[in-house]
Amino acid sequence: MIQDISRIKYTVKGLDIMRITITGRNIDLTQGLKDAVEEKLSKLEKYFKPDTDVYVTLSVEKERQKIEVTIPTKGHVIRSEQVSSDMYVSIDLVEE
């Protein structure tokens, strides 16, 4: 069951850089989690064209804290997934 969906749009000097949609499954999307995702993914904005959509799913399954990031681009889909026992660790690892 999807509990919360947040949409965050980055704007730098009036230009739309990336749109991040964060979905939580079996987890409450706290402001701290949203901020951690924003901070990590904002470092990637220099690699993508303006108006790039980024889809993030945070989920909890028993002891598994999982983050999935999907970035559709022209002709490709970039995807990263990390699992650990701590969601903040998973968020840190997904950027790499």
Task: Annotate each PLM feature.
Residues I2-E96:
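N-terminal, polar/charged subdomain of small-to-medium soluble alpha/beta proteins
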